[in-house]
Amino acid sequence: MYYYLEIECESPVKDIFTCNKRRASKVVGNSFGGDHFNFRLGEIKLLSMDFPSSKVPEVEETSLGHGVVHLYRVFPSESHEFDAPGLILAILAIPLYMSPSDVLGFLGEKHCKSIQHIRLLKTKDPNRIMALLKFKDQASVIRFYTEFNGKAFSQIDPETCHVLHIDKVNIKYPMESSDSSSTEQQLVGPSSKPFASTTPALIELPTCVVCLERMDSSITGLITIVCQHTFHCPCLQKWGNSSCPVCRYTQKVQSSEFQSKCTVCCYDKDLWICLICGNIGCGRYHDAHAKQHYVDTAHCYAMELETQRVWDYAGDNYVHRLLQSETDGKLVELSTDGKSSGWTGSSATESKLRDKMGLEYTQILVSQLESQRLYYESHLSNMSQKLSRVNEELVLKTKIATASSNANTDLRSRVDISESKLKKRDDKLKRVSSQLEHLKHNYEEEKSMNENLLVRIQTLEKQNTTKSDQIVSMQFQINDLNEQLRDLMFTISASQEIQKMGQSEELQNGTIVLPNNSTVRSNSVKSKKKKKKKPVVPSSSGSLGTD
């Protein structure tokens, strides 16, 4: 459902979303509709909020002068029925306690990023703040409409957010000519389609007299009562009186301003009003203009204004009227304030009237019983249909339950098998754990034994090193002693040879030469590998000198 917005104001604005103003002459008097006073005429204020690169938008207030805001509903054709929506949405009936900052907080930072411009239209009437939102893309429009349509403004108050798709915004200036009197703002998008240049073909949405809001059957429920006045269903529920709010007000005004008179002769007594068209005429005891109205129009029901009794010209008798009591809800007869012009006090007439009243009561009772029978039969048929649907659902649920039970049994058997396998694995795990503990204990014992052996080996290695050093030192001592022994043996053998040789002059003047210690030591190492040789005694001639 799409809507068309028309703003008729004094101050010209070229574009409502850019607020480029032109010079406007001062308007004197009522330029909206000539001499006819428009009760909706009032001052219109425009609050502009744009979203530039900065995060916080600037709020500018512009006065459009006195004017009227019209909202029309557009019925799209079949070819344009499934077109994508435009880029403009309208929020109706924003509460007065919400400031522009509250509106921004209600919209949220996420949606404000996808909005280019926000315009708030304020009028003098309460709850008449309308917000126009222009978005950057159609996806944001659809997402915003889905999320915010029907959303409550706050958790305390019952007001809800009503979001509408606006296809076109038209601004009219009554002081200019018809060709240049309006500045139209047309959306560019797949849903844009041409509109008529004039608005007589469009139907403006009516206003509820209780809450002063637009009445749209696609948004809220509407109810039309007997007097053909239409209201919002919640508004009529809040109205405590049983009478119509409009009729009650208009009847009070009429009764205070003037007195009812016959429309033909202006007679102000014994008046009868037609229940079909509301014509007032005098009774048959004056000029019988009420009956003449029945002859001319065939409107057979007329009510006497003094006694509130209804006369049937076709049946030539009074209509029996029953009212529902407000206390217990029973049907009671309408009481009369006085006798009518055709009432007689004779017992025959009273008996005849009682018979007619009884017959009418019987007819009413029969008709009510018939309507109740039809109602309860339809109710029983609905209940039987519901019962059949419930039985079908029960059969389906029984099948589903049986299948679920079979699946549950299968799952239980699988669970039992899995539990037995799990138990076996637990036993095996326990055995492996005990073996692991035993091996760990053996490992600890072997580890302690290895540590002890390692300490012992280190001690033995130290002892071995010490013994090796001792052996080396003793070997040196042995070598030294061997050298000394060799020298001693050499000396002894030499002395013996000398003694054998006798007292010769060569031996007396000779010199004994001994080898160095270093040579002896090096030769001692080689002597370990070779056989020990007998020392050679040098000749006395080579080693001894003469005096």
From Swiss-Prot:
This is RING finger protein ETP1 homolog. Gene3D superfamilies: Zinc/RING finger domain, C3HC4 (zinc finger). GO terms for molecular function: ubiquitin protein ligase activity; zinc ion binding. It comes from Schizosaccharomyces pombe (strain 972 / ATCC 24843) (Fission yeast). InterPro entries: BRAP2/ETP1_RRM, ETP1_RRM, RING-H2_BRAP2, Znf_RING, Znf_RING/FYVE/PHD, Znf_UBP. GO terms for biological process: protein ubiquitination; Ras protein signal transduction; regulation of signaling. One of its GO terms (cellular component) is cytosol. It comes from the Eukaryota. Signal peptide: none annotated.
